[in-house]
Amino acid sequence: MGALTSRQHAGVEEVDIPSNSVYRYPPKSGSYFASHFIMGGEKFDSTHPEGYLFGENSDLNFLGNRPVVFPYAAPPPQEPVKTLRSLVNIRKDTLRLVKCAEEVKSPGEEASKAKVHYNVEFTFDTDARVAITIYYQATEEFQNGIASYIPKDNSLQSETVQYKRGVCQQFCLPSHTVDPSEWAEEELGFDLDREVYPLVVHAVVDEGDEYFGHCHVLLGTFEKHTDGTFCVKPLKQKQVVDGVSYLLQEIYGIENKYNTQDSKVAEDEVSDNSAECVVCLSDVRDTLILPCRHLCLCNTCADTLRYQANNCPICRLPFRALLQIRAMRKKLGPLSPTSFNPIISSQTSDSEEHPSSENIPPGYEVVSLLEALNGPLTPSPAVPPLHVLGDGHLSGMLPSYGSDGHLPPVRTISPLDRLSDSSSQGLKLKKSLSKSTSQNSSVLHEEEDEHSCSESETQLSQRPSVQHLGEECGVTPESENLTLSSSGAIDQSSCTGTPLSSTISSPEGPASSSLAQSVMSMASSQISTDTVSSMSGSYIAPGTEEEGEALSSPQPASRAPSEEGEGLPAESPDSNFAGLPAGEQDAEGNDVIEEEDGSPTQEGQRTCAFLGMECDNNNDFDIASVKALDNKLCSEVCLPGAWQADDNAVSRNAQRRRLSSSSLEDSETRPCVWGPLAV
C-alpha cells in the first residue's frame, strides 16, 4: 500500500506495479501497511509498524493478487456496516486421508511394492446447494472476482459432486483416490515461491446469479510418516464473497471440548473449557476481543471492560475493538421433544435486559455460540434400551451405583459369590424385633403389619398371575423387565444393573425361579441396611464338610444372635418351608430338628457347614414365606432346596452353584426336615 495510501484523492488509478512486490510479504520495496487502520468505523494508530493485527504477516500471502481495485471508495458515514454471509463452511479439523480397503496393484508388480491409495473425507455445512471439487498441485487465479484453481495435470482433480443444503454432511467419494507417493517431496508442502497448493478443496455455491462467485476454499498439505503412510493437514481457509477474498482466522475459545474423546477431556480438565464468561462466570460468552481473537466475555462484562481497562483478560494484550457474535434459532414449541436447556434460557433472559435484544427477530431466541456450532455442551449419556425377554419372563435387576451402564450377564450367583458379596459390602443383617416395615425405607411398597408378635400363623393368599403382577407394578405387557430403582420404587426407565445382581430367566418355567432368585440376590447387592427390614428367621443352605472346614474362619461374620420375642412358625409341609434332605443334614451335623411350636433358631448361635448370609425377612417375622412384588404370596414359586455343584466345574473355587427348584411333590417321597427360609 505504502505510497498508494498516501495519495489524497480516493479515485481509482491504474498503477503498473508488479504483483509480486507490493502484494507479497515482505515486499521488495515500500511498506505493506499504513500508519493507521480502521476498525468498527473508528480510526486507530498502528502501535506496531508493519504488523498484521489478526495473524502472522506470512498469512497475507494467502490473500492472492489484487482481487479488487484499489484504493477502496470510502463508504458514507451514515451507511451501516454490511454483514457478510458465509453459506459454506468446511470443518477443517475433519479433513483426513482414509486408506483404501484394497491396495492397487499394477500388472506384474510384486505384492510388497503395491501402491497404497487414499480417499479424501471431511465434514461440511452449507445453507445452499454447493458443488465440491478437489484439486491437487494447483495454482490460484482470480478473474473478475471469481477464484479458480488449475492443476498441473487434468488427472489431478476429482469429479464435481453436488450437495443440497444441510449441516454435518460427510464428503466421501470412493471412486476418487490419490497416491501422494507419486509426487516429489517438495510437492507435498506449500512453497511461496512456486505458489502451488498441494491440496485444494473448492466448494462453490450453485444458487443462481445472486450468489455468483461465492465459494469456500480449504488449502491443505501432505505429510509423510516414518512408516511410509501419508496424512493431510489443513493449511488455510478462504472465503470469496462478492468478488473479495477473505482469509479466515481461528477464534480461540469457540471449540467444544465436551464432544472430544474422554481421554482428551481428562487431560484438559485444568484448561479453560467452559462456556461461561471468564469475568462473571455466569453468562455465556458471546463477545470477541480484537485483535487477539479471544472469545471470553459476555456482552455485559465486555461493555463494562471498555471503560475500566483495555487489556484482554486472557493474554493481557491491549484490545482495539469488541465484536459480539450471537447465534439465534427458532423458538421451540411446547410439544417439542427437545429438553429444556438452562444455558439457553439464561442467555435469553439476560439478553432481554439489554437494548441489543431489540435486534432479535420475532419467533427467534438467542442460543449459545458454542452450542450452535458444536451441539449440546453436555450431552446426556445414552440410555441402553430395555431388553424384552420371552413371554412371562421377569428379570429382577438391582440399581446401579457406579458408572458402568452395561447390563450384567445372565447367570446364577453361587454361594461363594454370595459370601464374598456379603463380606465386601459389609452388610450384617440381624433379626429385628420390629413388627412393621417402614414405607420409606423398604425396597418394595408394603402395607404396615398390624399383627402382634404372639401370632404364629397368618392366612396365606394365592399369588397372582405374571401378567397381573406386571400390571400392578406398572409394567406393560410389551416390556416385562422389572428394575428396582435406588429410590425404592419400581423404575422401568432405568436399565442399568450392578455386576453382582442376577438376571435369571427360565425358558421352561416362566416364573419358576427367577423371582425367588432375584429376591435372594437383594441380600448380596449394594442395598443399605435400612432398605431390608425385619424378617422372621434364617435359612442356612447345606453343604459339604470340606466347604465347612475351608470356610470356618469367617464364622463370626455370618452368625447373628437370636433374640427373644419372635414368632413361632408352625410345622406344615407347605410353601412356607424348604425341604432339606435328612441325610445331608445329618452328615453336616446341623442341629436343625422338627419342632411343634419351637423357635426355628435355638437360643444362642447356629452353626452351619456352609456359612451363608443370615438376612431378615421383608415380611413380618411370624411368616416364613416368599412374597411377590405386590406383597402377596408367590404360591407358584418353588423355594430353593439344596446347593448342587455344576457338572462343568473344574475346581471347588471355580464352581458355579445353582439353586435347584425342586417340586413340592418330591417332598413326599423322601425324608425331609422342614426349616424356615431367609432371603
Curated annotation (Swiss-Prot):
Covalent lipid sites (N-myristoyl glycine): G2
GO CC: one term? cytoplasm
Alphabetical UniProt keywords? Cytoplasm, Lipoprotein, Metal-binding, Myristate, Phosphoprotein, Transferase, Ubl conjugation pathway, Zinc, Zinc-finger
Instruction: Report whether Hydrolase shows up as a keyword of the record.
Output: no
Where does the UniProt annotation locate this protein?
Answer: Cytoplasm
Regions of biased composition (Polar residues) lie at 339-349, 478-537
A Pfam entry, by short name? zf-C3HC4_3
Asked whether the UniProt record includes Zinc among its keywords, one would answer yes
Cross-referenced InterPro entries:
MGRN1/RNF157-like, Znf_RING, Znf_RING/FYVE/PHD
Q: What induces it?
A: Expression is cell cycle-specific with higher levels in cells arrested in G1/S and G2/M.
Bias type Acidic residues, positions = 585-598
Q: Where are the Phosphoserine modifications?
A: S660, S661, S662, S663
Main location class? cytoplasm
Where is the motif named D-box 2 mapped on this chain? 656-659
Span(s) of short sequence motif D-box 1: 329-332
Q: Which GO terms describe its biological process?
A: negative regulation of apoptotic process; positive regulation of dendrite extension; protein ubiquitination
Where in the sequence is the signal peptide annotated? none
Catalytic activity as recorded in UniProt: S-ubiquitinyl-[E2 ubiquitin-conjugating enzyme]-L-cysteine + [acceptor protein]-L-lysine = [E2 ubiquitin-conjugating enzyme]-L-cysteine + N(6)-ubiquitinyl-[acceptor protein]-L-lysine
List the RING-type ZnF regions, as residue ranges.
277-316
For the region Disordered, what residue ranges are annotated? 339-362, 416-604, 650-679
Q: Give the protein's function.
A: E3 ubiquitin ligase that ubiquitinates APBB1 for its degradation by the proteasome and thus prevents apoptosis and promotes survival of neurons. Has a dual role in neurons as it is also required for dendrite growth and maintenance for which its ligase activity is not critical. May act as a scaffold molecule to regulate this process. Acts as a downstream effector of the interconnected PI3K and MAPK signaling pathways and thus participates in the regulation of the cell cycle.
> Domain remarks in the entry?
The D-box motifs play a key role in RNF157 stabilization.
Q: Which PANTHER family match?
A: E3 UBIQUITIN LIGASE RNF157, MAHOGUNIN
Describe, as the record does, how this protein assembles with itself and its partners. Answer: Interacts with APBB1. Interacts with CHD1; CHD1-binding controls RNF157 stability. Interacts with ATRN, MEGF8, TECR, MSI2, PLRG1, BYSL, MTERF3, PSMA1, MRPS18B, PRPF4, FASTKD2, SLC25A1, SMU1, CNOT9, MRPS2, MAGT1, FXR2, EMD, PSMD8, HDAC1, RAN, HSD17B12, TXNDC5 and MRPL19.
| Protein name per the record | E3 ubiquitin ligase RNF157
